[in-house]
Regions:
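Leucine-rich repeat
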Residues: 1-501
Length: 501
């Protein structure tokens, strides 16, 4: 009978949405003495714990509750004086029971002082400082051998040279270091040496402060020597599933040259400056990450008058998703459209191992405010370099500004036509809805037709409530799915590769 009750308690716990109710077992314990005995005897399997957060009477809970693991969660807002006193009590006298710590400044500066002792049960540690002025740092005597999840946000252990906290932790499953003041505070060689001792790592997040970065003891143009100097140790991250990086592309090049992540399925990259160097190490890294292959890709360029002009590249499956949830994302700032395309081409070359699996490609130019004057011309070779890795693309979708810009390269009035190796498997071209785009790219299509590679044309659905052709919505390609047939450019396209809304 006790086993049946215990199974019911397990089901009751699992039925709680997202596990947000930390006191689900309180009422059950007060039902009767028998239930209380069963629950306390099975506290480990039922994952019982005391949850301390804002307004909780920690002293009373510690005095009158069974010796269960402690969750200390004050990471959302500032703590009151009474909360600080309660947390100090728990950290000083019950550190052997603490399983989760989530603290933030300004109270963090006082609380870390008493953490210079072993925390044998601690599995989850998150320390937050929204202002690096506090510079809180864990004592050197702090240890947590069972730590599985570590997140430090602008905390002194990140900005201190060498990140000493990492020196004693080997069993991490997730590691998030954000607000790192400078790459010199976290040398690639040191980071790789620590990552090599974390075989269970599934998520790695590195976010630097957006400050100018100069590679230590190297000139800006000596990239090969920089990378050669880093080849001292390799970290085999056989379980790494997600990698998030925000910083300088040169640091990323050094890091990915020293790690392997064969089962990586999610990659998010954000560069502080446009990529000014080739990215061969990133290309090698992606070659080894064989799981990072998806059939749809989107390039979004933005106008110079936008708040943060730049390029965004998204790669994902064909199912609906939002850009924030896409398994692969990369973004870098850049103002001029010609430089955007040139840098995107450089990135496209680096991403060739994964872009070769793409079957559907979408090119978009986003601008809410049009700038005066003619945009700078885009070299044809930049377009060819951008498109060359897409050897398997069957469908190309172009938005209003993109079809104009790309047509100059694919259908030049003078000069040689586009090379045969550009989009060799293309069979469907989706153009903007309005009739003025009807004949664009026809010479390119005719050349492919003559070569025995026919390309059918389709139109995007019209934008709802559009009063004129000049109000073409850049997201019109996501309009309702309509029937697709083979009557050329007079029909609307039915395929919807992405849904960003």
């Amino acid at each position: 009978m006790d086993d049946i009750l215990l199974e019911i308690f397990h089901c009751y716990r699992l039925d709680i949405p997202w596990g947000w109710d930390h006191k689900w077992w309180y009422k059950l314990m007060h039902t009767c003495r028998r239930w209380r005995y069963i629950i306390l005897e099975s506290s480990s399997s039922l994952q019982l714990h005391l949850y301390f957060t804002h307004g909780k009477p920690i002293g009373e809970m510690l005095e009158h509750s069974p010796p269960l693991p402690l969750f200390i969660d004050y990471g959302k807002t500032e703590m009151s004086t009474k909360d600080e006193e309660g947390v100090l009590l728990a950290l000083q006298h019950h550190h052997g029971r603490v399983r989760l710590i989530n603290l933030r400044e300004p109270a963090l500066q006082k609380l870390v002082v008493v953490m210079g002792k072993p925390f044998p049960m601690l599995e989850n540690l998150k320390l937050i400082s929204l202002d690096p002025w506090y510079c809180s740092q864990l004592p050197e005597t702090f240890t947590a051998q069972r730590l599985r999840h570590l997140a430090l946000i602008q905390v002194g252990d990140v900005s201190a040279p060498g990140v000493p906290l990492l020196a004693s932790i080997t069993g991490l499953v997730t590691l998030s270091l954000r607000g790192i003041s400078s790459p010199t505070d976290l040398p690639v060689n040191y980071l790789v040496s620590r990552l090599s001792l974390m075989p269970l790592l599934e998520l790695l997040c590195l976010e630097f402060d957006s400050e100018p970065f100069v590679f230590r003891s190297s000139s800006p143009g000596n990239v090969k020597n920089d990378l050669a100097a880093l080849q001292t140790q390799m970290a085999q991250l056989s379980k790494l599933d997600e990698f998030i990086f925000e910083g300088h592309c040169r640091y990323l090049e050094g890091l990915v040259s020293c790690i392997r992540a064969p089962v990586l399925t999610c990659l998010t990259l954000s560069f502080f400056t446009r990529p000014s160097i080739p990215l061969p190490r990133l290309s090698e890294f992606l070659t080894a990450a064989e799981e990072l292959r998806y059939p749809a890709c989107s390039f979004t360029f933005s106008g110079p008058t936008e708040e943060n002009p730049g390029v965004s590249i998204v790669v994902a499956g064909l199912e609906e998703f939002s850009p924030e949830d896409a398994p692969f994302r990369i973004r870098f700032p850049c103002r001029r459209i010609d430089t955007q395309v040139a840098c995107a081409a450089r990135v496209s070359t680096a991403l060739a191992p994964m872009l070769s699996s793409v079957e559907r490609l979408h090119l978009e130019y986003y601008a809410t405010r049009w700038h005066k004057g003619l945009p700078p011309p885009i070299p044809h070779e930049a377009w060819f370099e951008l498109l060359r890795p897409f050897s398997n693309v069957q469908k190309l979708q172009l938005e209003t500004a993109m079809i104009r810009k790309l047509s100059f390269a694919l259908c030049p009035e003078d000069g040689p036509p586009a090379p045969e190796g550009i989009l060799p498997k293309l069979s469907k071209l989706i153009r903007p809805h309005h009739a003025r785009f009807e004949g664009m790219l026809d010479p390119f299509i005719a050349a492919r037709q003559a070569a025995g590679q026919p390309i059918s044309k389709r139109r995007c659905p019209p934008t709802p409530n559009s009063d004129s052709e000049d109000h073409d919505d850049p997201w019109s390609w996501l309009a309702s799915q309509l029937a697709d047939d083979d009557e050329g450019s007079t029909e609307l396209d039915s395929d919807s590769d992405f849904d960003f809304e």
